[in-house]
């Protein structure tokens, strides 16, 4: 069945809210990324399109799960997709050495895109802080807040941390799969990226 929403809205075959499309709009071909909490190699993945269609380089970090069977199942799914040539580290995102990861993969610390999405949200914030404190300077950060269900405003907490490092809010009130009641992310940009703050409902419309 034809999806009429695609006529009017920016929708990705892979990411939940078009994070990959936004990154490509900003930086085009041959970009760089770090994907924290990558999850499935394709479904819901923010960097699959960028790596396989647009020649982006980078790496993913995902512990998997505390349940070893679930963790091994996720690892096996990645092995079934050889088109995912960029490295994935099966590691704890909070204690991972991101500068070492950047160096091992011949990347620059000024990466284009950081996707930050692990559970619970407190750990997502901790992982974000670890990246920045390791000296990495992403131009775009897609940060999961799960605002629709969290008692804390993790978007505000992330902004309060990032603002002294010269970041601004790029896209606010990002919702999942065109469900306006499911605000779950904020997209931050470095101040040197020429982009004015907008609401996601404005960005996601094609016309």
Residue ranges: model-predicted function:
Residues 1-14, 207:
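Membrane-proximal basic amphipathic "stem/tether" segments
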Residues 8, 90, 112-116:
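Surface-exposed cleft-lining segments at the edges of enzyme active sites
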Residues 9-99:
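SAM cofactor-binding core of SAM-dependent methyltransferases
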Residues 25, 103, 129-132:
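Short amphipathic alpha-helices and their capping/turn segments at secondary-structure boundaries
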Residues 48-49, 56-57, 109-116, 120-207:
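Conserved acidic-Pro-Pro-aromatic motif
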Residues 101-107:
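Conserved amphipathic alpha-helix within the SDR
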């Amino acid at each position: 069945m034809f999806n009429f929403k695609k006529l009017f809205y920016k929708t990705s075959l892979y990411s939940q809210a078009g994070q990959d499309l936004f990154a490509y709009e900003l930086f085009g071909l041959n970009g760089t990324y770090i994907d924290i909490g990558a999850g499935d190699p394709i479904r819901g993945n923010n960097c699959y399109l960028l790596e396989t269609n647009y020649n982006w380089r980078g790496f993913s970090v995902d512990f998997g799960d505390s349940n070893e069977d679930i963790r091994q199942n996720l690892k096996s799914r990645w092995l079934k997709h050889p088109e995912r040539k960029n490295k994935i580290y099966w590691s704890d995102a909070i204690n991972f050495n991101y500068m070492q990861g950047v160096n091992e993969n011949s990347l620059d610390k000024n990466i284009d895109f950081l996707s930050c999405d692990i559970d619970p949200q407190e750990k997502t914030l901790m992982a974000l802080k670890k990246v920045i404190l390791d000296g990495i300077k992403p131009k775009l950060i897609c940060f999961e807040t799960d605002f629709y269900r969290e008692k804390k405003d993790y978007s505000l907490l992330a902004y309060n941390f990032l603002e002294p490092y010269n970041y601004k809010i790029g896209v606010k009130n990002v919702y999942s799969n065109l469900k306006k009641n499911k605000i779950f992310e904020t997209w931050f940009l470095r101040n040197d990226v020429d982009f004015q703050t907008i609401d996601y409902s404005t960005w996601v419309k094609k016309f």
